[in-house]
Amino acid sequence: MEIRRRPPNPKVRVAHLEYAVPHDDEAPRHILEEIVWEKDREVAQARERVPLEKLKSQVAALPAPRDFVAALKASCRKPAVIAEVKKASPSKGVIREDFDPEAIAKAYAEGGASCLSVLTDKRFFQGGFEVLVQVRQVVDLPLLCKEFILSPYQLYQARAAGADAVLLIAAILTDQDISYLLKVARSLGLQVLLEVHDAAELERALGFEGVQLIGINNRDLTSFDTDLATTETLTATYGEQLRQSGALLVSESGLFSRDDLDRVQSAGADAVLVGEALMRQSDVQQALETLISG
């Protein structure tokens, strides 16, 4: 799958990254491409407001990141749970009206989450880096910045806001993109969850050295349809390669019950990322405890 890019200002493009550019009168072909085009505009605007050098200064003053991977490995609950702080999504609209990131994060920590994921996209998920900052202030758990990362600048944004790990989505990045972003992330001490949805993307992910986390997204980001069989199908074919890679496998999206967790764990998942199933409940701590214990 090719995701076309539409950078609003060619001067901010990284010269060695290659991607298709649509004509000015073309519309995005699906929601994922729309998100990517908007993200290119958003990043260009952010660079104007906050220069990279300022972010670098902020990052230099921070303590070392927490070890996201170690927290998942150390979990006595299997599969380990990455609980997500998410207000809305493009497919479901607002998921939680009474959105209090600090209270939600504390509840997740008390409920047994190994790590947290925080949505930072504004337009489509109603999140923000300020939400990540809020969560960082109230919990000690490792945090994943859940974002559509296209530029190294966003890695500095994530680190400055308190992230310990970042999401890279194979569907929206070339191999050159991924290699370069992995290098920058490592220089910042950020661990990377490299997300795939199909066999071609998983084969690409397995080709990168040192990837510690591979996520299988059960949601097709072009349609937002979800199917847990995605994890089962890919692990049935690539299970041995995944084990040999040494990467932890995270199953993402469409997980609503203990049976769902058992299903993907049986397929080989070491951890799960759960958001909507928890965010729709009035008592998220109880919901998480129930999800974990069954």
Curated annotation (Swiss-Prot):
Enzyme class: lyase
Molecular function as annotated in GO: indole-3-glycerol-phosphate synthase activity; phosphoribosylanthranilate isomerase activity
Disulfide pairings: none
Biological process (GO), any one: L-tryptophan biosynthetic process
Pathway membership, UniProt: Amino-acid biosynthesis; L-tryptophan biosynthesis; L-tryptophan from chorismate: step 4/5
Alphabetical list of InterPro entries matching this protein: Aldolase_TIM, Indole-3-glycerol_P_synth, Indole-3-glycerol_P_synth_dom, Indole-3-GlycerolPSynthase_CS, RibuloseP-bd_barrel
Entry EC no(s): 4.1.1.48
Reaction catalyzed: 1-(2-carboxyphenylamino)-1-deoxy-D-ribulose 5-phosphate + H(+) = (1S,2R)-1-C-(indol-3-yl)glycerol 3-phosphate + CO2 + H2O
Keywords in alphabetical order: Amino-acid biosynthesis, Aromatic amino acid biosynthesis, Decarboxylase, Lyase, Tryptophan biosynthesis
HAMAP family assigned to the protein according to its UniProt record, in alphabetical order: IGPS_B (MF_00134_B)
NCBIfam families to which the protein is assigned, alphabetical: PRK00278.1-4, PRK00278.2-4
Family designation: Belongs to the TrpC family.
Protein name per UniProt: Indole-3-glycerol phosphate synthase
